[in-house]
Amino acid sequence: MEKLPCVYILAKASHGTLYTGVTSDLPGRVWQHREGLIRGFTQRYGIKRLVWFERHDSMDSAIIREKRIKRWPRAWKYDLIHEHNPSWRDLAEEFGFPPLLLK
């Protein structure tokens, strides 16, 4: 399977706790988060819903974008999600995952 660098945002609920990450295998990383295999913040707070992602040509550009977004105020991240996914639906459906319901 071809690797595709992505920046992504997971949410626990609409306008809830967010996690911003970067990966070269978005479906694989989503699966890891959903299964609780990644120790730390997302596992501790049950953050599993993919609400935004952005593809990049290289990991370097994806990492730069991730670092920028992580420095943004929460409101800017909400605006970014709302601009591309106003209903905060679970975008993991695009990769064949069953949708997670909003809490």
Task: For the regions a language model picked out, list residue spans one by one.
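GIY-YIG nuclease catalytic motif and its immediate N-terminal context
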Residues: 1-39, 43-55, 60-67, 84-86, ...
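A short acidic/small-residue loop/turn micro-motif
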Residues: 26, 72-73
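A short, polar/charged loop-to-alpha-helix boundary motif
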Residues: 75-81
